[in-house]
């Protein structure tokens, strides 16, 4: 069953333009480097007015919980986590199944 994985990222200070570009480049490499997800999106909030300090969002979908677990353990993802930890990032993650209970409007 498809799993949606959403993560919000908060940092104690604003990332530099170079750091923000590095973060985006790392995530952009995942479809080729990791290859387990069926969707991968990453962006920043448009206004910052309602983010409560979480200006970055990662949206991914995986074909199964097993694929999500493989992604979490993948060395490329582990390198990303180390990059986040080096910047004292506070992530907020949420995973759930995409099924008849959660899909309220089909694509």
Model-assigned labels for residue ranges:
Residues 1-56, 63-73, 89, 96-107:
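Short S/T/G/P-rich N-terminal loop/turn motif that feeds into the first structured element of a domain
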